[in-house]
Amino acid sequence: MDLLQYTFFQHALLGSLLASIACGIIGTYIVTRRLVFISGGITHASFGGIGLGLFAGISPILSAAVFSVLSAFGVEWLSKRKDMREDSAIAVFWTLGMALGIMFSFLSPGFAPDLSAYLFGNILTITRGDLLMLGLLAIILIIFFCLFIHPIIYVAFDREFACSQGIPVAVFEYLLMMFIALTIVSCLRMVGIVLAISLLTIPQMTANLFTYSFKRIIWLSIGIGFLGCLGGLFVSYHWKVPSGASIIFVSILIYAVCKVIKR
């Protein structure tokens, strides 16, 4: 394959693998705990951090990470209050992040920034720094889930039972929300804000067609996610279409085929 000779494509392949590992692990918790809507809110809230980074002249990804983690904590805290419904808390941070992102990006000095890279992503432009961030996150998630897999499963499936077992549920919930936020930000370069949530849900939905085991869903999700990324890259190359959209298209196609097979 001639493509494999290019550094940018090698980076894209490695980024796909690392992102598939990170998304496969934390995405299984998201789908099991039914946090898809919350994750979507955090994804769009990260746009506020991107705008702030562009305005302040710092790394947009770094500021997006901080903003996303704080938004995740805010959603978690507000959703536990009796005077605030969870969907309302999500809507607050979702719209606040988007509004701040637009405002700060237009107030940024110099030429108007190109926001399409953050909204829609391009896996072919990921850098060594992005790979290091993804690799570090994947390693941390592997270690964390290996050490605390049973408490995480208890929290994911039955919060009340986890509390009765003396598990510090609130601590795990906040830590996992932080990992969700960091994983979302790490994938922005690949598929962008608009499509990032798909990497955290579609492979898990596909895996769930074949097994209900939490651990097996993780393993299958990683493989399915990587397959979707590979397919998306080649579709993008041959059809000359955006890589982020191609990855999601192939992932949904895989889900549809598996759904038909399992009928």
List the model feature ranges, each with a label.
Residues 131-202:
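Helix-loop-helix "hairpin" substructures at the membrane interface of multi-pass membrane proteins
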Residues 190, 194-245:
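Transmembrane alpha-helical segments in multi-pass inner-membrane proteins
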